[in-house]
Amino acid sequence: MLVDSHCHLDYYTEEELEAVIGRALEAGVERMVTIGVRVEQAAQVKALADRFPQVWGTVGVHPQNVGEAPIPTVEELVALTEHPRVIGIGESGLDYFYDKAPREVQQESFRRHIRACQRTGLPLVIHARDADDDIAAILAEERAAGGPFPALLHCFSSTRALAEAVVAEGGYVSLSGILTFPKSEELRAIAADLPEDRLLVETDSPYLAPAPLRGKRNEPALVAHTAAVLARVRGWDIAKVGEVTTRNFHRLFSQCV
């Protein structure tokens, strides 16, 4: 069994969805988390989770989208979580690569998402791109001010220092198809060293199809490719990857039963 801890199922057409879910189940992917990126999209996330028993959801505003509308308040974010199949908050974080919103706006949004996690106890799904120092600083500041909160560094491709900082505070790291890319030697070295009980896998589909399928549309079934590379770098078999990452997923997302 595998879990795709981060995908965007609402990006598929209605005609594609049944087939995408079906192929995931055939590949042994028995849980999928479809991710929130805008406030107005939360209803669609919840509808997908209601429709498919294998699908759960998160709610939040992606850092690339925070300049499109006023940042939701902490109270508004908490209200969005009030659904039995919402198991996390995000994805939120900082994206200084695209810089589609002012950095101070991204930072304020990130802080509000963290505070919503502190209020609800739900895990934070973190997006980090070219912003490692500010991500680590904000996480530490908010933890000191408001207390601990569970967190997942999604689609990890950042520095060893950021991964270790997240793990040191009890967080988790999710590996995507980037792990399979030929040039990802450093990422594979980090993945080999991270604590076993902090690892998850994901697709971030429909983006980031794994090697040798780069350039094609990604989907949850293909998380098996990432799992296979993780097995190789850890010296495990694929069954152990499934056992470890599924156990870690359920420990983090404890509302997913």
Q: Where are the predicted features?
A:
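Mid-domain alpha/beta scaffold segments of enzyme catalytic cores
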Residues: 1-257
